[in-house]
Amino acid sequence: MGTLNILLVDDDRNLVTTLSHGLLKAMGEATSVAVSFSGSEALSLLSTQVFDVVVSDFNMPGPSGLEFLNRIRQDHREIILVLITAYGTDALEEGVRQLGVGYITKPFEPAFLVQLIKDLIHDQDPVGRTDKVSRIVDKLGKSAGSSSSLRAGGQLLE
């Protein structure tokens, strides 16, 4: 089975450290986490590396938030996108819904992010999945449990 490649993008170095350790611990050895501290740095990484999941802060240097994720979506439809935000507005929810992006509002526990990523992997259209992501779906199995802080496409996951 291939490795699940995750890119974390946030200008808060402490949060990136906490989340990357949490993801590696929870998702297991078949996970690789790369980090970036700005939207422009992340776009550069995306031009040279392949990622299955991108988790991005809404408010950061360089292209930020929905603009950043929209640029990724234009070139990489297969990547699962997650937005981390402290701003849960109706306008943001509409933008997230249109892009098909999962999101979590701050503050949250790293376990919530892990669960959202698993849910988004399982919910991804099987036609659009790569063989590697399909194998990851089989390995992860559908986990139970969620939180009211978990959102996908602006909808609460239950």
Locate each region found by the language model.
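Two-component/phosphorelay signaling modules centered on CheY-like receiver
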Residues: 13-34
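Conserved Asp/Asn-Gly motif in the active-site loop of CheY-like receiver
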Residues: 33-40, 110
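Acidic catalytic/metal-coordinating carboxylates
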Residues: 38-41, 64-67
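Active-site beta3 strand of CheY-like receiver
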Residues: 49-55
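Receiver (REC) domain active-site loop signature in two-component systems and cognate sites
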Residues: 60
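Alpha4 helix (beta4-alpha4-beta5 surface) of REC/receiver domains from two-component response regulators
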Residues: 67, 88-104, 115
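CheY-like receiver
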Residues: 124-158
